[in-house]
């Protein structure tokens, strides 16, 4: 039986801190290893023909973490963009930043906007990177933008166009690593009919083989979207 692949995969990359702690390393070491794993999964998605990938890199709640860790995370993001953007271009990856931009450093926003502009014509993979993102905040910002629309013209399709993920279809599959079984305020509107897959594997240990397990599990599911399917 051929594998039925999702068009859009979203991933909550959890477990970096636990991975580092288990090895007696600083938490930031887990984040650096996690970035390497993300890079490999990006390449694997292209090889498989998956067209959309959304990675949850930093939530609106992550500001509550220790200041030194937050600082190190943003330094990692900036360093990663500078060192990897040419590779992303060569792979044909179009990158989009989703989430709030007003609380990010000007340097990081400038880098991300350059990446968005330079990659806008690439089509091998549409990569959405969620930084300072929260599902409730996304919906609230959409409501503020849509208040000028006449109520009679407002429907689900129109509302979706005001959300951060408007340029990608809703995720078909959400993967969360590290054993937690919740969506943690991620893409609340967009996950309405998304298939959920949870694994105990920590994100820094997440391999192509683990990713394929999730895809195989997804392929066996029958998506109903509220309908009754014949058995």
Curated annotation (Swiss-Prot):
GO terms for molecular function: magnesium ion binding; prenyltransferase activity. It is an enzyme of class 2 (transferase). The active site is at 14, 62 (proton acceptor). It comes from the Bacteria. PANTHER family: DEHYDRODOLICHYL DIPHOSPHATE SYNTHASE 2, DEHYDRODOLICHYL DIPHOSPHATE SYNTHASE FAMILY MEMBER. Keywords: Magnesium, Metal-binding, Transferase. Homodimer. Its EC number is 2.5.1.-. Substrate binds at residues 15-19, 27, 31, 59-61, 63, 65, 176, 182-184. Its cofactor is Mg(2+). GO terms for biological process: polyprenol biosynthetic process. CDD domains: Cis_IPPS (cd00475). Gene3D superfamilies: Decaprenyl diphosphate synthase-like. Belongs to the UPP synthase family. Transmembrane segments: none annotated. Catalyzes the condensation of isopentenyl diphosphate (IPP) with allylic pyrophosphates generating different type of terpenoids. Mg(2+) binds at residues 14, 195. This is Isoprenyl transferase. It holds the Pfam family Prenyltransf. Binds 2 magnesium ions per subunit.
């Amino acid at each position: 039986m051929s594998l039925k692949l999702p068009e859009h995969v979203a991933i909550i990359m959890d477990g970096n801190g636990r991975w580092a702690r288990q090895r007696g390393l600083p938490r930031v070491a887990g984040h650096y290893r996690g970035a390497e794993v993300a890079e490999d999964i990006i390449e694997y998605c292209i090889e498989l023909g998956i067209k959309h990938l959304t990675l949850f890199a930093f939530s609106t709640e992550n500001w509550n973490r220790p200041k030194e860790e937050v600082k190190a995370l943003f330094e990692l993001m900036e360093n990663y963009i500078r060192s990897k953007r040419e590779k992303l271009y060569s792979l044909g990856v179009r990158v989009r930043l989703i989430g709030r931009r007003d609380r990010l450093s000007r340097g990081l926003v400038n880098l991300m906007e350059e990446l968005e502009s330079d990659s806008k014509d690439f089509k091998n993979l549409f990569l959405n990177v969620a930084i300072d993102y929260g599902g409730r905040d996304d919906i609230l910002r959409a409501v503020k933008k849509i208040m000028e629309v006449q109520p009679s013209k407002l429907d689900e399709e129109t509302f979706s166009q005001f959300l951060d993920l408007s340029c990608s279809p809703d995720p078909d599959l959400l993967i969360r690593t590290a054993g937690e079984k919740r969506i943690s305020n991620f893409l609340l509107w967009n996950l309405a009919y998304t298939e959920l897959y949870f694994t105990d594997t920590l994100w820094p240990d997440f391999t192509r083989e683990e990713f394929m397990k999730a895809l195989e599990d997804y392929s066996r599911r029958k998506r109903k979207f509220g309908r009754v399917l014949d058995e």
